[in-house]
Amino acid sequence: MIIPNLPFNLPFNLPFNLPFNLPSILPSILVPLVGLLLPAITMVLSHLYIQNDEIL
């Protein structure tokens, strides 16, 4: 299967002019955000689960 190379600088018609190209900067924002928030949320939920656990 051939996957075409799609450039990230696709011409989008945005209603306002951005000083940078939005699709090319999205991975640099989303990857650290997911990399930091996902472990933090997991640690908080596991901490709350352990705190609410009762020994019967």
From Swiss-Prot:
One of its GO terms (cellular component) is photosystem I. GO terms for biological process: photosynthesis. It is a single-pass membrane protein. The chain crosses the membrane at residues 28-50. It holds the Pfam family PSI_8. It comes from the Eukaryota. InterPro entries: PSI_PsaI, PSI_PsaI_sf. It is found in: Plastid, Chloroplast thylakoid membrane. Belongs to the PsaI family. HAMAP family: PSI_PsaI (MF_00431). NCBIfam families: PS_I_psaI (TIGR03052). This is Photosystem I reaction center subunit VIII. The gene is psaI.
